Amino acid sequence: MGKEGANMSYKIAVASTDGKVVNQHFGRAEKFYIIEVSDDGTFCLETTRETSAACTDGEHSDDSLNKNVSLLSDCSYVLVSRIGPGAEYALNKKGITAFAISNYIDKSIEKIIIYHDRINKTN
């Protein structure tokens, strides 16, 4: 499962205005912080990626949505404050799991690491 590859690291895209708190709706986010999680559970900011808001003035742009999903296609997870069903479906089609969570980024990443370890555990 996932996009981890041989080294087992993976990426998490976080929608945030300040780099501290998960506080952006997927469709309104103009920037994602890309966090790399190593196989030992440590994580760090890899980069930021600028996106075009797919939802502006009550209108949705499928073109912007598809571009944003493609831009995040190397990520295993996306953390946002909210996400609509269409965006979640588009991410899922690319193998990306979205979580709607409003919390500090560090705390949210720690929860995703626990989740990731549980679903990828081999007995």
Residue ranges and their predicted role:
Residues 1-67, 74, 101-123:
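Non-catalytic interface/targeting segments
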